[in-house]
């Protein structure tokens, strides 16, 4: 459990960093054999790319670093429940385990919304563990959007 907490803490660092760059504060860390292979926050505004979610970024970085298109045996830690696009990427990458913090009833696609991994079109479903650092993950998002509303 201490290892899981450590990796989620790194994802929270990435989320905070994303928020400081005026990105929606979501962070992700990809781990293989107990080693961090990639870590990132959202980069959609920085790259002007709607697909530059934290999950997609770490999958791309890890595939490049390892020289392979799939990541069997890898674990992904994310501060927010992945959306449909990210859930599909997780499936295609053959991620072994997904750990996420806060649920996303509006945009999530794992235990909310379309429940992507339960669909017959899903090729691979990771083991899913939700609620890891849930309150911290949710608070980072709440604070970010609270400040956005004050700025408007």
Swiss-Prot record:
EC numbers on record: 3.5.4.33
UniProt domain CMP/dCMP-type deaminase: residue ranges: 2-111
Enzyme class: hydrolase
Phenotype for residue 55 to A: Lack of activity
Reactions the enzyme catalyzes: adenosine(34) in tRNA + H2O + H(+) = inosine(34) in tRNA + NH4(+)
Binding site for Zn(2+): 53, 83, 86
Cofactor(s), by name: Zn(2+)
Alphabetical list of HAMAP family matching this protein: tRNA_aden_deaminase (MF_00972)
Quaternary structure note: Homodimer.
Name by which UniProt lists this protein: tRNA-specific adenosine deaminase
Gene (name only): tadA
């Amino acid at each position: 459990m201490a290892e899981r907490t450590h990796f989620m803490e790194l994802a929270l660092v990435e989320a905070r960093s994303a928020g400081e760059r005026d990105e929606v504060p979501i962070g992700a860390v990809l781990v293989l054999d107990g080693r961090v292979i990639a870590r990132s926050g959202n980069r959609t505004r920085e790259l002007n790319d709607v697909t530059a979610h934290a999950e997609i970024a770490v999958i791309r970085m890890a595939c490049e670093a390892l020289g392979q298109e799939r990541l069997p045996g890898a674990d992904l830690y994310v501060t927010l429940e992945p959306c449909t696009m990210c859930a599909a990427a997780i499936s295609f990458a053959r991620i072994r385990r997904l750990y996420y913090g806060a649920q996303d009833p509006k945009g999530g696609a794992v235990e909310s919304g379309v429940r992507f991994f339960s669909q017959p079109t899903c090729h691979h479903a990771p083991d899913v563990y939700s609620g890891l650092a849930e309150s911290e993950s949710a608070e980072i998002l709440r604070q970010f959007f609270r400040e956005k509303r004050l700025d408007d």
